[in-house]
Design a protein with these regions (language model features):
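Catalytic phosphate/metal-binding cores of nucleic-acid and nucleotide-processing enzymes, i.e., regions
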Residues: 1-119
C-alpha cells in the first residue's frame, strides 16, 4: 500500500506543457509522487484506489462510508490510466487489469497481482 492520494489523468493539450492548469499541475505532482515511492505494477494487476472522504462529512457519515465503494467521479479507468502512465512510458504489456475505488479516511493506492487461470 502506498500513501498517495489518487489523481485522475486529465485531458491534456499542447499548451499544458508550459502553461499548466491546476488539474494538470496536480496530475504532474501525483506522477512525481508515484515515481518517488517506486510503485511497480505487474502484468496482471489489481489496483485499489482509496479516495479520502471530504472533511465536511459528519463523523457518523464517515464511519458509515469507510471502506464502501466509491461510485462518483473520478472514473476508475482514469485513475488506472494515470497510475500506468506514471510508472511506464509504454504500458501495452499490461494485459489484465482490475481497478477498484473505495472510500477511506486517507488516500492510498494498493497494488496487487491477479492470480489464477483464465477459463
Amino acid at each position: 500500500m502506498y500513501p498517495i492520494v489518487p489523481c485522475p489523468a486529465p485531458r491534456m493539450t499542447r499548451r499544458d506543457k508550459w502553461a499548466g492548469r491546476p488539474c494538470v499541475q496536480r496530475y504532474f505532482a501525483f506522477r512525481d509522487e508515484i515515481r518517488l515511492h517506486g510503485v511497480t505494477i505487474p502484468d496482471r494487476a489489481w489496483l485499489v484506489f482509496v479516495i479520502p472522504m471530504p472533511k465536511s462529512w459528519s463523523e457518523k457519515r464517515r464511519a458509515e462510508m469507510d471502506g464502501k465503494p466509491h461510485t462518483v467521479r473520478p472514473d476508475a479507468d482514469n485513475l488506472a490510466k494515470a497510475c500506468g502512465d506514471a510508472v511506464f512510458s509504454e504500458d501495452s504489456h499490461i494485459w489484465d487489469l482490475r481497478a477498484t475505488k473505495i472510500w477511506g479516511q486517507s488516500g492510498a493506492i494498493w497494488v496487487g497481482e491477479l492470480t489464477g487461470e483464465i477459463e
